[in-house]
Amino acid sequence: MYNKVILVGNLTRDVELRYLPSGSALAKIGIATNRRFKKQDGSQGDEVCFVDVNLFGRTAEIANQYLKKGSKILIEGRLVLESWTDQSGQKRSKHSVTAESLQMLDSKGASQGGYEGEDYSSYDSTPSYGATSSAKSAPNTQAPYKEPQIPEINIDDDEIPF
């Protein structure tokens, strides 16, 4: 199966950064994407889609440092279903995107010390404790991508609304 999402849009709110008990950073952002289309009567239609996105590790910290409400970004990631029980005991769920890479697209950043078009992939999303960087290591080597630990969703087919 293939699960890949690519979104270009603007942040709907400032980055919400917190740290997990493991020490890894988690940033929650919201993105608004627009789709323009031609209606049957010939006029232009505009459809806005709001998407919640989770960023992990160094990517989350970079997003918190450089992004703010209104920033234009490109996200590559995967679609996930989050499930929880609310305060009244109701089972709730929603779709969100777990980002695997982030590109900042604002052109104004280029003139202010710049981050335009930089790609911050979260291949290092799991923290490395006690690791030291060596000047003798081979250039352009990257650590392999490690999937963040996401708990398995326990849901019956009868609970799915469609």
Swiss-Prot record:
Domain SSB: residue ranges: 1-106
Chain ranges for the short sequence motif Important for interaction with partner proteins as given in the UniProt record: 157-162
CDD domains: SSB_OBF
Entry annotated with the keyword DNA damage: yes
Primary role: Plays an important role in DNA replication, recombination and repair. Binds to ssDNA and to an array of partner proteins to recruit them to their sites of action during DNA metabolism.
Subunit and partners: Homotetramer.
Protein name: Single-stranded DNA-binding protein
